[in-house]
Amino acid sequence: MPLSSQPAILIIGGAEDKVHGREILQTFWSRSGGNDAIIGIIPSASREPLLIGERYQTIFSDMGVKELKVLDIRDRAQGDDSGYRLFVEQCTGIFMTGGDQLRLCGLLADTPLMDRIRQRVHNGEISLAGTSAGAAVMGHHMIAGGSSGEWPNRALVDMAVGLGIVPEIVVDQHFHNRNRMARLLSAISTHPELLGLGIDEDTCAMFERDGSVKVIGQGTVSFVDARDMSYTNAALVGANAPLSLHNLRLNILVHGEVYHQVKQRAFPRVT
């Protein structure tokens, strides 16, 4: 099976195009099987799960799919619902909407349903997409909230445990749109082993099974690699003090460009 038709993980910075070209959503639809897709929509992060679930249901229905189901999970007990678990065994794609990432993790983390979704994703059996809050939960370490517009400092970011879909990353969404570079750097200062991803709105980082990450959409994806960081004062200063971070590697990619995790290199678009 060519890479372009294999299941993938799509991490979306929020506010993806839902009306015109719908390129990111079309890519998820295609990677989930196109007209043969069986897609589950998880709107649990939203305060209005029924409304947001129906919105995405309409979008994917218009594209043409084999089956659609909104997994309207509002309490943790539903994470062991036999009907939902059966659907997850049959589906080809799962889409997690935006909202509140803490709410999403509170409902799904360590449930049989989420454990099986993660397992099937890791086995390359299904595609998984998350937008906004649905993107934030992708790592094991998750940015749960914080501020922006300041210098990097530890008080700028609130961390929590995510869903561990791609455990080696930490994600910030609505990135340049909300001036969140300092927030991502603050998170990286205490977790330099992680690859930081700052994803702009209507932009997606698509993780392939060969270790490559392709950028799709209108904005940029910033890759902050601190694995060779030579120094930080994070452990020496107060929570509100400015942070020093030496020898970071920053790559900013646009549509069609690729970052390779293993090679730790960025590649321009092949035309």
From Swiss-Prot:
Exopeptidase that catalyzes the hydrolytic cleavage of multi-L-arginyl-poly-L-aspartic acid (cyanophycin; a water-insoluble reserve polymer) into aspartate-arginine dipeptides. It catalyses: [L-4-(L-arginin-2-N-yl)aspartate](n) + H2O = [L-4-(L-arginin-2-N-yl)aspartate](n-1) + L-4-(L-arginin-2-N-yl)aspartate. Optimum pH is 7.5. GO terms for biological process: proteolysis. It comes from the Bacteria. It comes from Synechocystis sp. (strain ATCC 27184 / PCC 6803 / Kazusa). Its EC number is 3.4.15.6. Optimum temperature is 35 degrees Celsius. This is Cyanophycinase. The lineage of its organism: Bacteria, Bacillati, Cyanobacteriota, Cyanophyceae, Synechococcales. The keyword Protease applies. Keywords: Hydrolase, Protease, Serine protease.
